[in-house]
C-alpha cells in the first residue's frame, strides 16, 4: 500500500505561520491588524494581548482579548481570558462560535513564554508537592527542562489551532546582539529577537516567514558651529529622514529574518498592502515553479477549505455529544452510588438499562439512552 501525498502550495498567505518582530512602537500591531482585515475580514481575526502587552488599547477598531495568564474564564467587564482557555474554546467551538475565525495574532510572543513559565511552575509544584520550585530553572529536574516544558505547552496550544483550520501570527520585539561568526571568529552585530534564544528558535524554526521591522534612518554630519582644541569643526549626526521597512532576507546576516519561499523580496515598506503582495508573490512564484495553474489551485483549495470546515463541524458535534454523554453517565453513576442500598429505587432503572442492552450504566453509549435513564433518576 502506498502512503503519503503530493503537497500543493496554498496561495492564501494566512495559511502560513508568520512572525513579525521589531522595536516597540514601530507599528507592528497596526500593520498586522490591517493585513488580517484585508485577508480575513473584520471578524476573521483576533489579537491576543498576552501578559503585560497593551498595544491594542491605542488602536481603534481592533478585535482583541487580553490574556494576562495561562488559564482563566472570560471576564466581559475587563475583556480578559486565559491564553490556553481561549485556545481550547476556539478548538471546541470553531464551527459555531468561531466559524469566521481564520487567524489568531499573538501580541507579543515573548509575553506568552512569561505566562507559560508560570504555568509550568504550577504544573511542577502540583506533581512534586514535596519539592516545590520557585523559578522555571528548578522545574522538572532543572538543566533546561523547565524551558523545554514551556516551549512544549506553548507550541501544543498553537498547533491545536491548526487542527481546526486556524493559523497564527506572532509579534515580538527586537534587540541588537553581538554574534561571533563560527567560521572566521569575527564578531558582528545582529538585529534579532529580544527573548531568550531558546524560545526564539522554537518559533523561528516553525514559521514560514519571519519579518523584521526596523527604521532606516538617513543621518548626515552637520556642523555644530563649534571647534575642537585643534580648530576643527565639531560635527554631530542629524537625522535627515527615516523610513520603516520589513526585511525578509539579509545577505549580510545582520538582520535575523527568514523565509521558506525562495522568491521573497529582500525588504518592503512597513504597510499591509506591501506585506500582502510580498508574501502572495513569493507563494505564487513557488507554485508556478512546480508547474501549477494558480487559478485551478485556488479552486481546489477553496473546495478543500469547505471540506475541512465540514470535517471540523462534524468533529465538534461528535465531541460535544460525547461530552454531554459523559456528564449524563456521571450523574447516573452518582445516583446509583447514593442509592446503592435502596434496591426498590435502582431496580427499575437497572431493568431499563438491560432493556436497552447495557449491563450497567457505565456501558451506555447513546446520548438519547443516557437522557432517558437520567430522567428516571430525577423522578
Annotated model-derived regions:
Residues 56-129:
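Conserved nucleotide-sensing/catalytic segment adjacent to the nucleotide-binding pocket
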Residues 108-198:
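P-loop NTPase motor core
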Residues 2-22, 26, 37, 46, ...:
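Interfaces that engage single-stranded nucleic acids at replication/repair/recombination sites
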Amino acid at each position: 500500500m502506498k502512503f503519503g501525498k503530493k503537497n500543493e502550495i496554498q496561495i492564501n498567505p494566512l495559511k502560513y505561520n508568520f512572525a513579525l518582530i521589531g522595536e516597540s512602537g514601530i507599528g507592528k500591531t497596526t500593520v498586522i491588524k490591517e493585513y488580517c482585515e484585508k485577508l480575513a475580514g473584520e471578524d476573521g481575526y483576533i489579537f491576543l494581548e498576552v501578559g503585560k502587552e497593551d498595544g491594542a488599547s491605542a488602536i481603534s477598531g481592533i478585535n482583541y482579548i487580553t490574556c494576562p495568564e495561562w488559564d482563566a474564564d472570560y471576564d466581559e467587564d475587563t475583556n480578559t481570558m486565559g491564553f490556553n482557555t481561549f485556545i481550547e474554546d476556539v478548538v471546541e467551538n470553531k464551527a459555531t462560535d468561531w466559524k469566521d475565525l481564520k487567524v489568531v495574532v499573538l501580541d507579543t510572543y515573548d509575553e506568552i513564554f512569561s505566562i507559560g513559565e508560570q504555568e509550568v511552575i504550577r504544573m511542577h509544584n502540583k506533581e512534586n508537592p514535596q519539592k516545590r520550585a520557585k523559578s522555571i530553572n528548578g522545574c522538572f529536574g532543572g538543566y533546561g527542562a523547565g524551558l523545554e516544558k514551556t516551549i512544549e505547552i506553548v507550541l501544543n496550544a498553537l498547533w491545536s489551532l491548526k487542527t481546526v483550520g486556524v493559523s497564527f501570527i506572532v509579534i515580538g520585539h527586537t534587540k541588537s546582539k553581538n554574534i561571533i561568526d563560527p567560521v572566521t571568529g569575527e564578531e558582528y552585530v545582529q538585529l534579532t529577537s529580544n527573548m531568550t534564544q531558546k524560545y526564539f528558535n522554537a518559533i523561528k524554526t516553525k514559521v514560514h516567514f519571519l519579518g523584521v521591522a526596523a527604521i532606516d534612518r538617513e543621518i548626515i554630519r552637520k556642523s555644530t558651529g563649534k571647534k575642537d582644541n585643534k580648530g576643527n569643526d565639531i560635527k554631530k549626526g542629524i537625522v535627515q529622514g527615516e523610513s520603516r521597512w520589513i526585511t525578509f532576507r539579509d545577505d549580510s546576516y545582520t538582520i535575523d529574518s527568514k523565509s521558506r519561499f525562495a522568491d521573497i523580496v529582500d525588504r518592503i515598506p512597513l504597510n499591509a498592502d506591501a506585506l500582502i503582495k510580498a508574501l502572495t508573490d513569493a507563494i505564487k512564484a513557488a507554485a508556478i515553479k512546480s508547474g501549477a495553474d494558480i487559478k485551478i489551485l485556488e479552486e481546489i483549495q477553496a473546495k478543500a477549505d469547505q471540506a475541512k470546515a465540514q470535517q471540523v463541524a462534524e468533529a465538534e458535534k461528535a465531541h460535544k455529544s460525547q461530552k454531554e454523554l459523559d456528564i449524563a453517565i456521571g450523574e447516573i453513576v452518582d445516583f446509583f452510588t447514593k442509592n446503592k442500598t435502596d434496591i426498590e429505587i435502582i431496580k427499575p432503572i437497572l431493568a431499563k438499562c438491560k432493556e436497552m442492552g447495557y449491563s450497567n450504566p457505565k456501558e451506555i453509549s447513546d446520548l438519547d439512552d443516557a437522557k432517558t435513564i437520567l430522567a428516571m433518576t430525577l423522578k
